[in-house]
Swiss-Prot record:
Pfam families: UPF0262. HAMAP family: UPF0262. It comes from Acidiphilium cryptum (strain JF-5). Belongs to the UPF0262 family. This is UPF0262 protein Acry_0160. InterPro entries: UCP032146. NCBIfam families: PRK02853.1. It comes from the Bacteria.
Amino acid sequence: MADGAAEIRGRLRRVVLDEDIGGALSPMQEADRNQAIADLAADNRFALGTHPDAVTILHLSVQDGRLVFDVRDEADETLQTLVLAPGPFRSMIRDYQMLLDSYATAVAEGREARIQAIDMGRRGLHNEGAELVMARLDGKVLLDFDTARRLFTLICALHRRA
């Protein structure tokens, strides 16, 4: 829904993750999550269809097994809550976690060629995840591809293994 990122006038001021999800992040997952949040803070295009110019705060969580996008205004009042079934994301999240585990092993073993191959696979999976995020939010949220990629990373962090 975001063919022209320049046309998307809204943006996220901040992203808040539900930290009450069980299980600790691996160092690689933590680094990915922190990088995604920093990148979103620096540059993003995100607008509700009903509030196309709003600067918003996104509270991202998993509640009752569902992915919740609680989009709020700058006064922290909910503008819209979007609830998505996690099913379409499950296999990508599982693949992403396996890639991160493989990456950590390759780094520990110093296998540069393997690290590069895994990194290419990870970029491809991020792209697929971004497309899925955009498809699932189509008609509700306008966002650019880079914002969708970063949100996919955060979705994976919320669904970490216990």
